[in-house]
Amino acid sequence: MGEWTILERLLEAAVQQHSTMIGRILLTVVVIFRILIVAIVGETVYDDEQTMFVCNTLQPGCNQACYDRAFPISHIRYWVFQIIMVCTPSLCFITYSVHQSAKQRERRYSTVFLALDRDPAESIGGPGGTGGGGSGGSKREDKKLQNAIVNGVLQNTETTSKETEPDCLEVKELTPHPSGLRTAARSKLRRQEGISRFYIIQVVFRNALEIGFLVGQYFLYGFSVPGLYECNRYPCIKEVECYVSRPTEKTVFLVFMFAVSGICVVLNLAELNHLGWRKIKLAVRGAQAKRKSVYEIRNKDLPRVSVPNFGRTQSSDSAYV
């Protein structure tokens, strides 16, 4: 049960930040109606499925062969494998989003990011011009800034000038430049677009896995578990009758898992309709607006050139009259 708790926490971490309302409902369905039911009820129902599978023969190996024919994969193991595979795209999305957030934090607090945010005009001579006083002041400011940055952290200039290797590092607040704010905003927007795109991709893969497991469950087990199973597989010397334990209870459980899988497929399609198509429409509209603006700028910048008409004219002075 501890392994299922870890999986639940990981799924909740993915949903809390980036998922839609439909995704939250889907998480509830997966956690309550799948993980908890399979972990608590399923183990009790299918605990003795092989030991209670009895055939009316004493032939050695006949019971095992007939059980393998009746249930190629145990119901409970099939559903556990289904839960793991269906949750894999969400776990990949968690890894991607955490990686992007870590990269954003590193880019925000790195010294390269601080250097890029500085105005080039200030490094030349400040807003006052490129004179001697401004140049000398800017050089002194650059030297102070270099002395203030130790190990990638902005330090107190007074303590840094006195001590070569400070024991206590004091961080000073840096006022961001407008260009740096624009760069950070564009970087954050690109990161959010990448996360949204990856979220749509993982929903598509998750829905494909749901449909695949739903079809596989139908071809393996059907919609019912028979109480009597006839088997003539080797090493049985003749056709024998085998009896399945708790057939009605297993049939109810099988139909319930069919219903849960169908609900998950419908919720995935609804989330794609809510999230995916809207994103596609916005992307198409943005691309069209961008092409239109580029076309207008090019037509505005290019000079108008009159093209001579080399065709036949209707003038009376024409040579072809």
UniProtKB/Swiss-Prot annotation:
Q: Which UniProt keywords apply?
A: Cell junction, Cell membrane, Gap junction, Membrane, Transmembrane, Transmembrane helix
Q: Gly residues bias: where?
A: 125-137
Q: Which residues lie on this side of the membrane: Cytoplasmic?
A: 1-19, 99-197, 276-321
Compartmental location: Cell membrane; Cell junction, Gap junction
The Gene Ontology biological process annotation of the record reads: cell-cell signaling; chemical synaptic transmission; neuronal action potential; visual perception
Give the record's membrane topology. Multi-pass membrane protein
Protein origin, superkingdom:
Eukaryota
Question: GO cellular component terms?
Answer: connexin complex; gap junction; synapse
Question: Is Transmembrane a UniProt keyword of this protein?
Answer: yes
Q: Where is this region: Disordered?
A: 120-141
Which Pfam families does this one have?
A: Connexin (PF00029)
Tissue specificity here reads: Highly expressed in neurons.
Please report which protein family the annotation says this sequence is part of: Belongs to the connexin family. Delta-type subfamily.
What is the annotated role of this protein in its UniProt record?
Answer: One gap junction consists of a cluster of closely packed pairs of transmembrane channels, the connexons, through which materials of low MW diffuse from one cell to a neighboring cell.
Q: What is this protein called?
A: Gap junction delta-2 protein
Name its species: Mus musculus (Mouse)
Q: Which gene encodes it?
A: Gjd2
